[in-house]
UniProtKB/Swiss-Prot annotation:
Organism the protein comes from: Tropheryma whipplei (strain Twist) (Whipple's bacillus)
Positions bound to ATP: 12, 174-176, 242-243, 251, 257-258, 274, 278
Gene: metK
Binding-site residues, Mg(2+): 14
GO terms of molecular function: ATP binding; magnesium ion binding; methionine adenosyltransferase activity
Known pathway: Amino-acid biosynthesis; S-adenosyl-L-methionine biosynthesis; S-adenosyl-L-methionine from L-methionine: step 1/1
Subunit architecture: Homotetramer; dimer of dimers.
Region (Flexible loop): 96-106
InterPro entries attached to this UniProt entry: ADOMET_SYNTHASE_CS (IPR022631), S-AdoMet_synt_C (IPR022630), S-AdoMet_synt_central (IPR022629), S-AdoMet_synt_N (IPR022628), S-AdoMet_synthetase (IPR002133), S-AdoMet_synthetase_sfam (IPR022636)
Protein's UniProt name: S-adenosylmethionine synthase
PANTHER family recorded: S-ADENOSYLMETHIONINE SYNTHETASE (PTHR11964)
A Gene Ontology biological process term: S-adenosylmethionine biosynthetic process
EC number: 2.5.1.6
NCBIfam families: metK (TIGR01034)
Length: 395
């Protein structure tokens, strides 16, 4: 089996927009932890346009947040792709639809007086939308992430690191990585097949020097730590040639266009919904994190070598309408028994998930580059001993 996954640097136009959307979201949550927000950003040709819905749009300095985010990434001149100091900023922010707000605030169960419906009951809040999400975990890395996306993220992060630390001072913010691995008959990663790096750079640098520097300073340090067989690997660094014009001046950026980069690469399914710019009442956010949290606990309990968790919701309903798991034949107990144990131990109602993972905090800008999963700074990446013991006991 061959598996390929890609990542992008924080300066990629789409990732720039993800970070702007989530930086604004963090600012909104700082003012009101119960705020609702769905923030989209588009960037191109020296213009940044934010639009969407926010329950308290006047509470934050949106232009100030946008400029700071752009400058922190490293876009300080139009020559690099956009200048955070001088770019044009446009806002089209409205409040959330009352119909949607009512559906979230008063669930179908609440309106029909079903179940435990006390004033602070987790059943009172409904899902912010319909849809399905997928969570995944496996034994390929200590982080329980697929190895191809893990390597791709490390390469993209390393590109930004050597730029910001002036190790390769001629690099500019835009960049991408892609990794192809070969798997053995037991579906374990075995060989490094191909690495692709595209790095934006200043006009003055020689292309051969750039290729050598990136191979030695970025690629080899990351790859050498993997233990993969690299004897037949192909390394393609800036295979298109020079990459001087980059960032939003070369390609317009848009929030939510790197959803596979954000999750598990090509190793798992995706429900199609983006995460960035959305407050934790949105199922693309709370349910995606919950599905990952559950998947990690199943693997940590040694009930499967890998698992894909699917959760589906209806707008305005607190309880999921569907739940499924796929262990790709690696389960150590019967699937129906494992599924019952998960549903017994974990509470999938939106308010319960938000409470369990402490999601009403300004944590989201950090998720918007180098993946939402695989970093233990996030609550959904941490194994809860009580949940793990409960899961072990439930089977």
């Amino acid at each position: 089996m061959i598996l390929t996954s890609e990542s992008v640097t924080e300066g990629h136009p789409d990732k720039l927009c993800d970070q702007i959307s989530d930086a604004i979201l963090d600012g909104v949550i700082c003012k009101d932890k119960n705020a609702r927000a769905g923030i989209e950003t588009i960037a191109g040709n020296g213009v940044v346009h934010v639009f969407g819905e926010v329950s308290n749009p006047d509470s934050v300095d949106i232009p100030g947040i946008i400029r700071k985010t752009i400058l922190d990434i490293g876009y300080t001149s139009e020559d690099a792709g956009i200048d955070g100091n001088t770019c044009s900023i446009q806002e089209s922010i409205t409040s959330q639809s009352k119909e949607i707000a009512d559906a979230v605030n008063f669930s179908l169960e609440y309106r029909n007086q079903q179940g435990d419906l006390g004033r602070n009951s987790f059943s009172q809040q409904g899902s912010g939308d319909q849809g399905s999400v997928f969570g995944y975990a496996c034994r390929e890395t200590p982080e329980m992430m697929p190895l191809p996306i893990t390597i791709a993220h490390k390469l993209a992060y390393s590109l930004a690191f050597v730029r910001k630390e002036k190790i390769l001072p001629y690099l500019l913010p835009d960049g991408k990585s892609q990794v192809t691995l070969g798997y053995d008959s037991a579906n374990r990663p075995k060989t490094l097949e191909t690495v692709v790096i595209s790095a934006q750079h200043e006009d003055s640098v020689d292309l051969d020097k750039l290729r050598f520097d990136i191979l030695e300073r970025v690629v080899r340090p990351v790859i050498s730590a993997t233990g993969l067989d690299c004897s037949k690997a192909t390394f393609l660094i800036n295979p298109a040639g020079r990459f001087v014009t980059g960032g939003p001046s070369a390609d317009s950026g848009l929030t939510g266009r790197k959803i596979v980069v954000d999750t598990y690469g090509c190793a798992a399914k995706h429900g199609g919904g983006a995460l960035s710019g959305k407050d934790p009442s949105k199922l693309d956010r709370f349910a995606s994190y919950m599905a990952r949290w559950v998947a990690k606990h199943v693997v940590a309990a040694d009930f499967a070598e890998s698992i894909e968790v699917q959760i589906s919701y209806a707008i305005g309903k607190a309880h999921p309408v569907a739940f499924n798991i796929d262990t790709h034949g690696t389960n150590t107990i019967a699937l129906d028994k494992l599924k019952r144990a998960i549903l017994k131990v974990f509470d999938f109602r939106p308010a319960a998930v938000i409470d369990s993972l402490d999601l009403k905090r300004p944590i989201y800008q950090k998720t918007a580059a180098y993946g939402h999963f695989g970093r233990d700074i996030f609550t959904w990446e941490r194994i809860c001993p009580d949940k793990l013991n409960a899961l072990l006991g439930a089977v």
